Amino acid sequence: MADGQMPFSCHYPSRLRRDPSGLSLSSRLLDDGFGMDPFPDDLTASWPDWALPRLSSAWPGTLRSGMVPRGPTATARFGVPAEGRTPPPFPGEPWKVCVNVHSFKPEELMVKIKDGYVEVSGKHEEKQQEGGIVSKNFTKKIQLPAEVDPVTVFASLSPEGLLIIEAPQVPPYSTFGESSFNNELPQDSQEVTCT
């Protein structure tokens, strides 16, 4: 084989200068799962095929959160929300977020709405285990989109340990005079006198 030629064809000329062994390393480095499965094997067996890609990635579709730059121009350029914000729901679809809480019991979880955020927290009581005391707790804050009324948010816990938080979108409001109906009051030809 001649020097500088690869044993396979490349569609992108910039890949010719890269080290072939480094390609798989860079894709794993940017992966949030660090090469691990998103769920244990027994949990993934019961999910339908269409739900697994949505639950295992941080962003719907093929984009991973580590591959898209986060900055003020990222929202305008890629349509990616800023850090700490949830993606806006599509028109007509409810807003929905899933949080994996499989290691917590329902009585150990708390969901509350405060200052435009849904706050999910969980806490295990301290347990005596081998060599010490173990305590687990977490808090996750999720910002509500502007299209969602905080009063309509509700949460449910699946048997697999997923906390599903959802809310319907607020229908768009129209100001008086913008709708298609006639703004004028009907004129009656009858006169009524009050005595």
From Swiss-Prot:
Q: What is this protein called?
A: Heat shock protein beta-8
* Keyword flag Nucleus: yes
UniProt-recorded Gene Ontology molecular function terms: protein homodimerization activity
The reply on keyword Nucleotide-binding is no
Q: Name one GO biological process term.
A: cellular response to unfolded protein
Q: Classify the main location.
A: cytoplasm
The UniProt similarity line reads: Belongs to the small heat shock protein (HSP20) family.
Q: State the oligomer form and interacting partners.
A: Monomer. Forms a ternary complex with BAG3 and HSPA1A. Component of the chaperone-assisted selective autophagy (CASA) complex consisting of BAG3, HSPA8/HSC70, HSPB8 and STUB1/CHIP. Interacts with HSPB1. Interacts with DNAJB6. Interacts with BAG3.
Asymmetric dimethylarginine found at: 70, 77
Q: Disordered: where is this region?
A: 175-195
Q: Which residues carry this modification: Phosphothreonine?
A: 62
Q: How is it modified after translation?
A: Phosphorylated.
